[in-house]
Amino acid sequence: LDKTREVIRRKCPEYLNCFDRVMKQTSGYMFNMFIVRKDLLDSYCTWLFDVLFELENKVDLTGLSEFQKRCFGRISELLFNVWLEYQLERNVVQVEQIKKFRWGYMEPIRSRKKIQAFLFAKFCGKRYRCSF
């Protein structure tokens, strides 16, 4: 995430305050799923992939597990929130326009393992090795 911040600072500094705010949040819009007008989608994709392609050149994936190599997908989930925050700040999108759909997770979740892995990651610095 430090490298992501650096890319944003260099390529699109107007987004930096939004990035910093989003990184302090404990919630957000995840899973890279949304319904949006084409012009906003084009704007988002242009910005997102410009940042991600630059970031890809700065991150060495050597020695990482297949799970860890999916970092760009996870970073893109956070970046959607940065982009959205910026659009809200500029009044391109209004809060009232954001609709949330409730959905259920269809696969079983191993809650005990998930909680245990989260605590180990949070307090012991042990990285996740798989999804739950």
Predicted regions and their residues:
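ER/Golgi luminal nucleotide-sugar-dependent glycosyltransferases, focusing on the catalytic module
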Residues: L1-F132
